Amino acid sequence: MLKKAQIIPAIAVVLALSLAPAMAENPQPRKIYSGWVPYYSMKTSLPAVLNNIDLIREVMPFWYTLKFAGNKVSITDLYSPANPSVPITTPLATMKGAGLSIIPTITDGTDKLVLSNLLSTENGRQAAVQAINNLVLTNNFDGIDLDFENFAFVDGNTSWDKTKPYWVAFVKSLSAALHANGKLLSITTPYLLDPTTGKKGYYVYAWAEIAPVIDRLRIMTYDYSVAKPGPIGPLSWTESTLKYAVSIMPASKVFVGLAGYGRDWVTKVEGVCPADVAKTVVAGAKAATFVMSNAANLAAGYGATIQYNETHQEATFTYQKIYNGNTATGLS
């Protein structure tokens, strides 16, 4: 069975956007990078941060998720179960000792519309604010990063008009609580576009309304193509959302999210697949992902030629792979 696939390597770091001119004399590395430190890849992500400390000023440990059950808001620690032999205080001390600001990320760990409904009441918003603020103060974090993607990808866009004002009220309350203690509020969201263009993007996140009260906006300028082969973060699309962001808030608040991965789409299958891969090697199946730094070796291993797309400003390559083995009917 012959598989034909298309690979598009698209890094995850976050790059700060600044409109200030660079200094010509005595140039020093500018600490313009930030990045997520996932709980599931500490052995590689933490060394990567420390090896680039001259460029990185802050990190977002991707370690927490918000839950709501039994009328109680709680924040679940994802780090400890994944790293039982290394106490959470160890990497925190290492990063603090390196002079990094620590702004952990909290994801939405609730089911469809649960967080939206929670934020629809003053009591619900205050419960969420208190839980998050307590996490920050108890651990002496420098702030918090909200990555509540369920609004965009789970709840459905028909809920956005209802959710939007509750979200804005919540962000304002959380900002006030954090700022009262000298802490920062960072927001991570998918893209938005200038509504005057007729295209809004994920407008539920209300950038214009929350801009005055947030300290960081981290834009997910990746995952442009997921289900079908295509660019991961095409330049024109990225520029459009950035132009809108800096038109409504200082550029110093805006961080550009860059993908650190590529996607491997199966575009065509010839023949009958062996039984052990028949369910996964299917044209149109969910794309596998790989680490960006492995892209060149992957292409070389298949004898593929990497091509650069001038329009999208991304690289891509296609390759063929042959699978041998018995089919489900016993044929080889």
Sequence positions of predicted segments:
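Glycan-recognition patch characteristic of GH18 chitinases/ENGases
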Residues: 25-134
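Aromatic-lined carbohydrate-recognition surfaces of secreted/lumenal glycan-active proteins
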Residues: 32-40, 171-204, 253-259
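Hydrophobic faces of well-ordered beta-strands that scaffold small-molecule active sites
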Residues: 33-35, 57-61, 102-106, 144-146, ...
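Substrate-binding cleft/loops of secretory-pathway carbohydrate-active enzymes
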Residues: 44-46, 190-221, 226, 262-283
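Aromatic- and acid-rich polysaccharide-binding/catalytic face
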Residues: 52-73, 204-232
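Active-site groove signature of glycoside hydrolases
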Residues: 63, 131-163, 216-229
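An active-site-proximal structural segment forming one wall of the substrate-binding cleft
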Residues: 120-144, 166-177, 198-213
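Glycan-binding loop/region signatures in secreted carbohydrate-active enzymes
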Residues: 260-332
